[in-house]
Every structure is written in C-alpha cells, then in structure tokens.
Amino acid sequence: MKVFEADSLLFEADKRTKEYKELRSQMVKLKKAFKEVANLDDSEFSGKGADNIKAFYHGHVGVTDQWIDLIDMKIAFLSSMSATLEDAKMSDAYIEESFLEHELANAYAKSKSIMSEQKKAMKDILNNINDILPLEIFSTEDFKDKLSSADDKREKTIDKLNKLDEDLKTEYAETEPNEQFIQQDFKKLQESTGKGKNATPIHYNAKAYRESDIHKKKGDIEKHSEAYLSVKKEEAKEREIKELKKKLNDGVSDPDEYLEIAKKVGYENLEPTQVQLAVQIEQAKQLEGAGEITWDIVKGVGVGLYDVGKDTVTGIWDFITDPGETLSALGNAAMHPVKTYDAISAAIEESYQKDMVNGDAYSRSRWVTYAIGSVAVAVVGTKGAGAINKADAAGKVINKASQAGKKIKDVKIPDLLPYNPKYKLALADNVPYNVVDSQNLKNELLTNAKKIPDGTRKPFTGQKKSPPWLNKEKYDAYEIEGKVKAKGKVKDVSRRVYTMKDIDINQKTEFGVTNLQLMKNGNAPYAKDGTQINLHHLIQEEPGPMLEIPNSLHTKYSDVIHQLKSDGESFRNDKVLKAQYESFRKRYWKWRAKQFENEN
C-alpha cells in the first residue's frame, strides 16, 4: 500500500537535485581533463601508441557527454516535481492508501448501516403512536447525498494518487535507455583496448569502437535526450509565464516593472488588455525621454493605465448586477440600486476633489488616465467596483478579493493616454497641462454609473443534484438559479428542473436546424420521437419544479398531469407570471445549450 507525503518527497527531490548538480560539475571538469589529453599536440605526444591513447581519451569525452545528458534529464525531472504535484493539487498532501481503501470504505458502509437501522427504529416508534399523532419519518436524502459525495471524493483521491504515482514512475523511466546505453557503450570502449595483458589504451582500436553495434545507437540516444530536455524546458517556460502573468494580474503598478515582466512573458502570451497597457506605458516613457512630460506624469499614467486595465478585466459588472451580495462581504446590508449609485457617485466626486482639484502631477495623471479608460469602455459594461476602487473609492463600495481571477479576454482598451489629440486639453496660463477636460470626464463617469443593471442579464446557473429516487438512466436533476424581467418587474425564477439525458444535440429538424442551434436561440429541442420537448410544471406553480418531457407524452397524459389546477387557476391567466415563464423558458434553453457545449 502506498503512503504519499508531499513534503518528504519534495525535500528528497530538492536534495537529490543538488547532488546531481554537484555531480554534473564534476563531470564537466572530467570532460575538460579528457579533452586536454585527447587534444595534445604532436610535438608533445606523437607516434602510433600516442594516437591510440589520444583517441581513447576522445572516446571518454563522448561517454562523459552522455553522462552529462543523463544528469540533465535527472535534474529536469526532479526540478519539475513540485509543479507536477501542484498541478495534481497534491503539493501539501499526506495520503495513506490503506486508510482510504479500508478504514474509510468500512466507515462508509457502517454509516449507511447505522442510518438505516436508526431510521427503521424510528419508523417503528412512529407507527406505535400513529393513531395518536401521525408523523412522517425523517428524510435521509441529504445524508445519503453527502455520504455519497464523501465516498466519491475518497475514490477520486485513490485514482489521483495512483495516476500521480504512475505518471512519476513513467517519466522517471525515461532515463533508463540512457543508463543502459552508457553502461554498454563504456564497456565497449574498454574492450576496444585489447584483451588480457594487451588491454591498454596504447592498443585502443578506435575503428572497432565506432563501428560497434552499441555505439551506432548513440545518435538515437542523443535524440531521445534532446527531445526530453526540450519538453521539460518548454514546460518550465510555460510555468514561468503562468507565474508572471499571475503577478501582472495580482498587481504591478510600477511602469518599469510592468514592462520588464510583459517583455519577459512575451506580448504574444499576454491578454489583449495587458498588451495595450504595456504599449501605452512604452509610449509614455518615450514622451518622458523626449522631455515632453515629467516622470511624475509618466508614473501616474502608468498606474492609471494599470488601474483601468485591471478593472476592465475584473469588472464593475459583477458589482453592479448584484450589489447586495458583493457588499455583504463588507458587512453591509443589501443595497438598492439607487443607493448603490449614491455610493459610487460620492466616491467619484471625492476622488475628483482629492486627485484632480487638490492633487499633484502624479495623482492628476493617474486619475485622468483612469477616467478616460473608464468612460471609453462605458464603466458598467465591462468595468466594475474595482473601477471605483482605483479612483480611491475602494474600501467604500467593493470587496476587491471577491473579484479576483475573473477575465474578459476580448476587451480592448482604446487610446487611454491623457495627451491623445482626440481629447480636449485643459489649459493653465496658456500652457498645455497634458490632461483632458477632467470636469467633463467626471460628469461622464457619473452618467455611466447611473446605468445600473438589475441582475436579469446574468446567465442562468445550474447545480446538479442526485435525489436517490431519481431514474438516473433517463434523467438528471439541476437547481437552476437566475432572474428575469417580466412586465417591468425583476423576478427570481430559480427552480429545480429534471432534464432528459438522451437529447441528441446533432438531431436536425426538417429545415436542417440542429437541436443545439435551437437551444442557442432559446427554443426547445426535439426528442427522439420527433416531437418538441415540453417544460412541464410538476405542481402547476410558477415558478415551480419542472420536467423536460416529449410533447407526445405531454399531450397523451395531459388530463392526468394537469389535475392539480383548473383552467381558471392556471398561472398563465396572470400576465406577469406568463411573461415570467416565457422569459425563463427562453433563457433556460440557452443555459442547456451552454451546458451541452461545456460537456463536449
């Protein structure tokens, strides 16, 4: 049984890496010494015996090269181990396979048994008092779901452990061909010096060594080493780029540092906003170098560009669409959109007075650059609470941490710099101050901040459930969450929907439209019997639990499945509820389309 301890494994890997590096250093020195003998001038060492000896040491140079390649492969493998564990999310894990396969498995079975016995005992008790006080037995559905989830996690951990173990052993075995070749090639080198008492370097037969079957494999071994080291080098480069990009996303406000990292990552590996930001900072530095603006302004522009660039990809959208949820992290009560706007506008006004009216060259350049970027991308469209944050409204309205890691890859920041000709220059004593009409910018920020969405544009989300009684061969269950606007009112349309598992997304209508295309447009797909799928209200309530069902069955059993409500009681008689359901249905099928795309 395996015992996996990440700390010990990484400690030993680091220790062994250092040992291999020391061995490599010694091999390089040894190779140098061999080459010095092999390259002795004829004036120093000549004759047939001397030539044989020099050729013999030249052969040792080749063997030493093979050793260095092998050591490099070992170092590359050991150095990448921490990243391998991190990718497997096991960089700090301690796992005993026997515990997972025996103790936990037994505990799972025992827990199920105990719950079953307790439920049976409770049922007997309730039956005894049923004539006095009829009571329903408690549900074990939630318990079973959580127990099943825990057992699933146990099994996945075992699989992950075995996969990691197999992957590491497989990669470690990559050096075995090199090791075998070195041993056999070195043996052949020794044998080429003769036999018995005549086995000395002076009798070395270079031709016999070069033409031996084992030595002819040298080229293949070198290609193998080169290919492996090339892959490991590329992996290391990708990890470095990933770490540097994370650093850019986390926050680098110094222009010099931002440019240095951007160039190291390579513009081709940056997000569009990061490329734009790097280019703009370079332009600002060029102007500073030409003496057109001061370094304080350059630094302010750089920070402002970083501010707006980061906000563009983290977004005011999330904050505005659900201010209550976002602000609750700060201990605030849920806020009405009007109050949200009041908070934003107050923050904008305060930052304007602080950084523009009473600021210096640095703060003014930063504020204007930020403001232009905010207006250019229409604050609420792709920016967010982080945007207000960067205009020094930060702590007042946004929990920055809740926005981390979100990206909008297709955002392109326009020309944000304050000296761009398309913006008006504000003049002081008839001298261009290198800023735009900031008062007008402030007004535009306030105008955009009024466009507060209400949460109805956010895509639906669905969380899978596993009720024990569900026929899992035919259906899945999802808790759908979302909001729609019906007759001017924002309505929460969250509900459970039981989804058919045999929908063929490639099935076509008579007009050649696939089910996936239908769903993308918000329309119901077709079942395999050729009838369109109906969303049936199980308890005839809107909103309420629903079932996907072929229209053929919906029609066939209509009298049975609609007995809960009379025609006069149908929610469809309520204009708001009817509009609410129609909006839900369209948005729901779009969610299903996205779900199918993610699965494939």
From Swiss-Prot:
Q: Keywords of this protein's UniProt record, alphabetized? A: Coiled coil, Hydrolase, Nuclease, Secreted, Toxin
- Phenotype of null mutants: Deletion of the yobL-yobK operon has no visible growth phenotype, however it is out-competed by wild-type cells.
Q: Does the keyword Coiled coil apply?
A: yes
Please verify whether the record's keywords include Nucleus: no
Q: Where in the cell is it found?
A: Secreted
Instruction: Give me the segments passing through the membrane.
Output: none
Question: Per UniProt, what is one GO molecular function of this protein?
Answer: toxin activity
Domain (LXG): residue spans on this chain: 1-235
Q: Name one GO cellular component term.
A: extracellular region
The induction comment states: Expressed on rich and minimal solid media likely in early stationary phase; not dependent on DegSU. Not expressed in liquid LB, but only under conditions that promote biofilm formation.
Q: Which residues form a coiled coil?
A: 12-40, 141-176
What role does this protein play? Toxic component of one of 6 LXG toxin-immunity modules in this strain. They promote kin selection, mediate competition in biofilms, and drive spatial segregation of different strains, indicating that LXG toxins may help avoid warfare between strains in biofilms. Mediates intercellular competition during biofilm formation; disruption of the operon disadvantages the bacteria, but overexpression of the cognate immunity protein restores growth in competition with wild-type.
Similarity-based family: In the N-terminal section; belongs to the LXG family.
Outline the subunit composition. Interacts with cognate immunity protein YobK but not with non-cognate putative immunity protein YezG. The interaction inhibits the toxic activity of YobL.
Name it.
Answer: Toxin YobL
Instruction: Name the species this protein comes from.
Output: Bacillus subtilis (strain 168)
